[in-house]
UniProtKB/Swiss-Prot annotation:
It is linked to Zimmermann-Laband syndrome 3: A form of Zimmermann-Laband syndrome, a rare developmental disorder characterized by facial dysmorphism with bulbous nose and thick floppy ears, gingival enlargement, hypoplasia or aplasia of terminal phalanges and nails, hypertrichosis, joint hyperextensibility, and hepatosplenomegaly. Some patients manifest intellectual disability with or without epilepsy. ZLS3 inheritance is autosomal dominant. InterPro entries: CaM-bd_dom, CaM-bd_dom_sf, K_chnl_Ca-activ_SK, K_chnl_dom. GO terms for cellular component: neuron projection; neuronal cell body; plasma membrane; Z disc. Residues 30-40, 52-95, 138-147, 717-731 have a biased composition (Low complexity). It is found in: Cell membrane; Cytoplasm, Myofibril, Sarcomere, Z line. The lineage of its organism: Eukaryota, Metazoa, Chordata, Craniata, Vertebrata. It is a multi-pass membrane protein. This is Small conductance calcium-activated potassium channel protein 3. Residues 494-514 dip into the membrane without crossing it. SUPFAM superfamilies: Small-conductance potassium channel, Voltage-gated potassium channels. SMART domains: CaMBD. Belongs to the potassium channel KCNN family. KCa2.3/KCNN3 subfamily. One of its GO terms (biological process) is potassium ion transmembrane transport. Residues 41-51 have a biased composition (Pro residues).
Length: 731
């Protein structure tokens, strides 16, 4: 309750701050303000109390004051006129006392008497909120209020349900994402709680004001939307109309605010998703860095421990500890990476629980990745006996080898992180436009798609880098596997191992160098398989590079067509020439030379065969020119023609429609023509009759011969007009 006599309630447990006082004041300042208000305003009379109910314990020391207030109130009631029955019915249907809104059960609560004149106008919505408010006041353990100085009372604390209802939607989204995704953001404080604390500090020292029946207080109950739309409702007699108008305005603003919250939720999700994308990319980069660092340190430790110092030295222990530290960091980065993956899955699919994303396939994939990245040389010296059979002598060989070999070679499996980094840094994956187009075409942007695009853009570079990397790694692996059983230092030498890998990679296999151990044989087997695939890719890339482009094909086809046209013309000319020569030597000459005739006949047949062969080549060239590109061009031409035909058909339909409208107009005109003709004939007949009557009148006045008057109604004799049964002489 503020100083103006208004009781504001923002729903259950939600109290808006007073706009006049933006910050809380201290206790001394509040006491001074209360004293000034008490000096300026006289104490109003108290509301009537029921005589059958005793007063609360907090007001028992003041019975004389209450009696005086009751007497004054009774006098005012006698002076006031009676109220209408409609207002009393409203009062009986919804009995609401102002003290129920902010007072505690132990404080003074005066029940309304039977003849109370406090007229209230609550709506059905307000009444339901008041009943809920009373229920929470009576049943909530946190709704008790402590009386402050000056007879004031503190506002009740909100229940957990009320606190959940008053929370900001943006804060709720952030808190829910933190709850389900594993703490991406720090928990944010609830805005409504801070506002409630501010209101408690402001209204702590305000005294409880009592109103007389002649000036009843207005109880304004509004929702959070009403408080945002209307911060303060003034106290005036026409309160019902203004409160209904405010309720209508608040209900009209509900849907835009819901849409705004929805837009805020979508914007927050998109921003959160973008942040997760960036974090996932950085985690992948860091994982690749630490993975490559562990591989490099492993290679250095293996080479140094073979030639310079032993496995039990401090240098080897320090390097292995460094490898273990980098492996632990790598495992943590991988866990963080998959955490971001799960969070992205939750955001993309709108899931409520992150456990929905943990399918058996994902769990198996994460476990396999953790196992691959966890393999590394353990600090310390561990040995085992390794037995093998030499290649050419077939004698068994037994040597004591380090366990680090078994744990070092699988560390090269960490190179799969390169493909992940390439995917996350690819423009096709990071560009929003390309991802939108791919989603419309149902394309999955994965590592396979990125490698295909790289093979299309720069196939030579990709094959070169892959072949050289595979060559070096396989050669070093063969060297490590063969060093314990190679007594002649052939395959254990790095250059010799590179030669062995190269001839195996190219599927040559001279046989001068062969591996002794199963480890080396397995590496050579994998190298041969990869070499066959790379060789096929090289052949395909070279063939694609040697293929003519579209422009080059068109130029080549044009030149070949020109040459074939010339050859056809030459062959046709030869046919005509030989035909003329044969006719000349057989018909025109007196003495026939049979040798020349046979010669020209032979050339004539050769010219005919040459003409046929050239025409066949021209047909083949035309068939080769009809490629897919030409078909697409023809399709475009046909599409243009069909479009033009459609336009013309539309124009023709429009013209036919105009002709139909004109024909309808002509039909209507022809239908109205008989009526027009009848009207015209009638008018002419009337004019003729009038002319005859005028002529007859003139003849009578002059004294001409008398014409007998006809018996017709218009005064014209039947003999004046010829009939079909009278001749022209009778007329």
């Amino acid at each position: 309750m503020d100083t103006s006599g208004h009781f504001h309630d923002s729903g259950v447990g939600d109290l808006d701050e007073d706009p006049k006082c933006p910050c809380p004041s201290s206790g001394d300042e509040q006491q001074q303000q209360q004293q000034q208000q008490q000096q300026q305003q006289p104490p109003p009379p108290a509301p009537p109390a029921a005589p059958q109910q005793p007063l609360g314990p907090s007001l028992q020391p003041q019975p004389p004051q209450l009696q005086q207030q009751q007497q004054q109130q009774q006098q005012q009631q006698q002076q006031q006129p009676p109220h209408p029955l409609s207002q009393l019915a409203q009062l009986q249907s919804q009995p609401v006392h102002p003290g129920l809104l902010h007072s505690s059960p132990t404080a003074f609560r005066a029940p309304p008497s039977s003849n109370s004149t406090a007229i209230l106008h609550p709506s059905s919505r307000q009444g339901s909120q008041l009943n809920l408010n009373d229920h929470l006041l009576g049943h909530s353990p946190s709704s008790t209020a402590t009386s402050g100085p000056g007879g004031g009372s503190r506002h009740r604390q909100a229940s957990p349900l009320v606190h959940r209802r008053d929370s900001n939607p943006f804060t709720e989204i952030a808190m829910s994402s933190c709850k389900y995704s594993g703490g991406v953001m720090k928990p944010l404080s609830r805005l409504s709680a801070s506002r409630r604390n501010l209101i408690e500090a402001e209204t702590e020292g305000q005294p409880l004001q009592l109103f007389s029946p002649s000036n009843p207080p207005e109880i304004v109950i509004s929702s959070r939307e009403d408080n945002h739309a209307h911060q303060t409702l003034l106290h005036h007699p026409n309160a019902t109309h203004n409160h209904q108008h405010a309720g209508t305005t608040a209900s009209s603003t509900t849907f835009p605010k819901a849409n705004k919250r929805k837009n805020q939720n979508i914007g927050y999700k998109l921003g959160h998703r973008r942040a997760l994308f960036e974090k996932r990319k950085r985690l992948s980069d860091y994982a690749l860095i630490f993975g490559m660092f562990g591989i490099v340190v492993m290679v250095i430790e293996t080479e140094l421990s073979w030639g310079l110092y032993s496995k039990d030295s401090m240098f080897s222990l320090a390097l292995k500890c460094l490898i273990s530290l980098s492996t632990i960091i790598l495992l943590g980065l991988i866990i963080a990476y998959h955490t971001r993956e799960v969070q992205l899955f939750v955001i993309d699919n709108g899931a409520d629980d992150w456990r929905i994303a943990m399918t058996y396939e994902r769990i198996l994939y994460i476990s396999l990745e953790m196992l691959v990245c966890a393999i590394h040389p353990i600090p310390g010296e561990y040995k085992f006996f390794w037995t093998a059979r030499l290649a050419f002598s077939y004698t068994p060989s037994r040597a004591e080898a380090d366990v680090d070999i078994i744990l070092s070679i699988p560390m090269f499996l960490r190179l799969y992180l390169i493909a992940r980094v390439m995917l996350l840094h690819s423009k096709l994956f990071t560009d929003a436009s390309s991802r939108s187009i791919g989603a419309l075409n149902k394309i999955n942007f994965n590592t396979r798609f990125v490698m295909k695009t790289l093979m299309t853009i720069c196939p030579g570079t990709v094959l070169l880098v892959f072949s050289i990397s595979l060559w070096i790694i396989a050669a070093w692996t063969v060297r490590v596997c063969e060093r314990y059983h190679d007594q002649q230092d052939v395959t254990s030498n790095f250059l010799g191992a590179m030669w062995l890998i190269s001839i195996t990679f190219l599927s040559i296999g001279y046989g001068d160098m062969v591996p002794h151990t199963y480890c080396g044989k397995g590496v050579c087997l994998l190298t041969g398989i990869m070499g066959a695939g790379c060789t096929a890719l090289v052949v395909a890339v070279v063939a694609r590079k040697l293929e003519l482009t579209k422009a080059e094909k068109h130029v080549h086809n044009f030149m070949m067509d020109t040459q074939l046209t010339k050859r056809i013309k030459n062959a046709a000319a030869n046919v005509l020439r030989e035909t003329w020569l044969i006719y000349k030597h057989t018909k025109l000459l007196k003495k026939i030379d049979h040798a020349k005739v046979r010669k020209h006949q032979r050339k004539f047949l050769q010219a005919i065969h040459q003409l046929r062969s050239v025409k066949m080549e021209q047909r083949k060239l035309s068939d080769q020119a009809n490629t897919l590109v030409d078909l697409s061009k023809m399709q475009n031409v046909m599409y243009d023609l069909i479009t033009e035909l459609n336009d013309r058909s539309e124009d023709l339909e429009k013209q036919i429609g105009s002709l139909e409208s004109k024909l309808e107009h002509l039909t209507a005109s022809f239908n109205s023509l008989p009526l027009l003709i009848a009207d015209t004939l009638r008018q002419q007949q009337q004019q003729l009759l009038s002319a005859i009557i005028e002529a007859r009148g003139v003849s009578v006045a002059v004294g001409t011969t008398h014409t007998p008057i006809s018996d017709s109604p218009i005064g014209v004799s039947s003999t004046s007009f010829p009939t079909p049964y009278t001749s022209s002489s009778s007329c």
